[in-house]
């Protein structure tokens, strides 16, 4: 949806294409996304947009970073995150938390589903818990 970026737990990409090629293909759906914006998004998550390595050779953490780049390349007003730190090493988690906090400070609304209390503490102003289909405000 326009104005919304979504990060899923296990992003799927075309294995025989580079990270840039995958995002370029998706960007064709939104003609307003330039190659430079795609490259900037890839750089923001700590990947090299000029890297020709095929996504099939990416580590799980690299694919997760590319998924985050995909979600932010349209500069969405709202980011929906499903376990956004899955597959990232300690350094990657720290980098992505900093990026997401920066986006939040710039006015992006962030909705996060996570089992990680630290992600929730760092990224969320309000916390809700879902249990047996019931949603309860925690704080």
Regions found by a protein language model. Name each.
Residues 114-115:
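H-loop/switch region of ABC-family ATPase nucleotide-binding domains
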Residues 94-106:
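Helical segment within the ABC ATPase nucleotide-binding domain
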């Amino acid at each position: 949806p326009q104005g919304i970026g979504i990060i899923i737990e296990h992003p799927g990409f075309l294995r025989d294409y580079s990270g840039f090629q995958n995002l370029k293909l998706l960007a064709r759906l939104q003609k307003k996304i330039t190659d430079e914006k795609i490259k900037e998004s890839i750089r923001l998550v700590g990947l090299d947009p000029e890297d020709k390595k095929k996504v099939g050779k990416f580590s799980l953490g690299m694919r997760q970073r590319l998924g985050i780049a995909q979600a932010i390349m349209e500069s969405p007003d709202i980011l929906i995150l499903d376990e956004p730190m899955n597959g990232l090493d300690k350094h990657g988690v720290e980098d992505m938390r900093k990026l997401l906090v920066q986006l939040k400070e710039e006015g992006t609304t962030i909705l996060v589903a996570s089992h990680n209390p630290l992600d929730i503490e760092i990224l969320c102003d309000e916390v809700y818990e879902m249990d047996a289909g019931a949603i309860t405000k925690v704080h």
